[in-house]
Amino acid sequence: NFWIVQGCYRSIGGYNGGTYVSNYFDTNIYMLDGDSIQTFATFDFGSMNLPKDFFEGETKELVPKFNDFRENNKAVLNIDNTTITDDWIVFCPPLFEPKEVIYCNRKNGKYLINNDFSGFYAKVLGKYDAPDGYDSRSGEFYRLVNAALLKEAIEELQQSDEHYLEKYPFLKGTDPEKMDEESNDWVIFFKT
């Protein structure tokens, strides 16, 4: 009868005709396909795994233990912001400070931790934010970016680097003076 407010730390999305889901207190990704459910991927974080006996005991013992694990980053309690592609599984373990985005290469099983964005990319894509999705036709991840934030970031680039378009050619034709700060979010596409 253990009860903890779990918040919204879970993911749901589509991949290859199925629907994937993740849930709190679980580092598996499940694939729903019709009437069946399969474990699609299991992540092992070694010493950062939630102990197998974590849920043994009464609520009055478990709540302080849970708070200790959560507040002191002692375990990966779940995965969130999940995006699945043919080559990658991308997710973010929530509640970690600093946040980290983990890119798991499905072909070789290696992990990349993308916590070193800097400058323009950090401001626009978020230094520790997972992508919002993936376009399988172009092979690009995408992220929704606030128009006012994008305008400000481009203006800063213009002032600090007169050759910024050589470094960021995808900004050609984007004039911050013509951008409406009140417009809908922009979609930025990028590859890993």
Residue spans for each PLM region:
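Structural signature of eukaryotic scaffold interfaces centered on beta-propeller domains
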Residues: N1-N23, P64-D86, D129-S138
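Structural motif
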Residues: F25-L32, L95-C104, L149-E162, S183-I188
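Conserved blade-ending motifs and adjacent loop-strand segments that build the rim/top face
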Residues: F40-K74, K107-S138, V145, L150-I154, ...
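Sequence/structural signature of beta-propeller modules
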Residues: N49, D161-T192
